From Swiss-Prot:
Claim: Ribonucleoprotein is one of the keywords in the record: yes
Gene behind this protein: rpmJ
Annotated TM spans: none
Keywords: Ribonucleoprotein, Ribosomal protein
Family in the record: Belongs to the bacterial ribosomal protein bL36 family.
Name assigned to this protein: Large ribosomal subunit protein bL36
One function term, GO molecular function aspect: structural constituent of ribosome
Top-rank taxon, per record: Bacteria
Amino acid sequence: MKVRASLKKRTPECKIVRRNGRLYVINKKNPKYKQRQG
């Protein structure tokens, strides 16, 4: 998982989700795009 200052959807399958007050990008098809806002 990458920690980034600003999240971007890198593919159309990416979803932005808020968990515990943090923003995450999840991608079921290609998990290498997982990100968290730091």
